[in-house]
Design a protein with these regions (language model features):
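A short beta-strand-loop structural module common to alpha/beta enzyme folds
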Residues: 2-22
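Alpha-helical cap/lid subdomain in secreted, periplasmic
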Residues: 3-7, 24-171
Length: 172
């Protein structure tokens, strides 16, 4: 991203939930300026652990708080939750996939209304073996490469097109 004059800082936390996101971003803002862009990739580990209504509520609160109160002028990008071949908190992968898709749709709808952006990950929808590690939950090295490449492509599109008013970036 250096060719666009931007640097990237990765802030991650094992087990992060949506309700942690606000405090993490408050801490980040206290240490430095408000960033130009934040990409949020969070929530898939808790599909099945929390009711989907609670998960969507936490997402909406986080999006609204970040965009309106904490990070004015910052572009918020939601990286949709990836499918998993196996889910930790469910005996029915099919039901959890339906929940994941429903929550992604809800997050996408909410964020686009708030003039945020969404990154989709269509390469993962077919759940090819090579994209996942042996545990069928985490990504393989190839899966991570594709994931990062999708994020980079979306960011490059945003940087090139960011001068367009009302742009709603949904990469495919």
């Amino acid at each position: 991203m250096k060719k666009f004059g931007y640097s990237i800082t990765w802030i991650g936390m094992d087990g992060m939930k949506w309700k942690h996101l606000i405090n993490i971003n408050l801490g980040m803002v206290n240490l430095s300026d408000i960033p130009y862009i934040i990409i949020i990739h969070c929530g898939a580990n808790y599909v099945g652990e929390e009711p989907s209504g609670n998960l969507m509520y936490d997402m909406k609160v986080a999006f609204s708080s970040l965009i309106i109160e904490i990070l004015p002028g910052c572009s918020i990008i939601f990286s949709e939750m990836l499918p998993k071949r196996t889910l930790r908190f469910s005996y029915s992968t099919h039901k959890m996939e339906k929940t994941r898709k429903r929550v992604n749709r809800g997050a996408r709808s909410c964020l686009l209304k708030l003039l945020g952006y969404v990154i989709k990950h269509p390469d993962f929808e077919d759940k090819y073996n090579g994209l996942f590690a042996k545990d069928d939950v985490h990504l393989s090295f190839i899966g991570y490469d594709i994931f990062i490449n999708t994020l980079q492509g979306a960011l490059e599109s945003l940087f090139v097109l960011s001068s367009l008013p009302g742009l709603q970036l949904i990469t495919q």
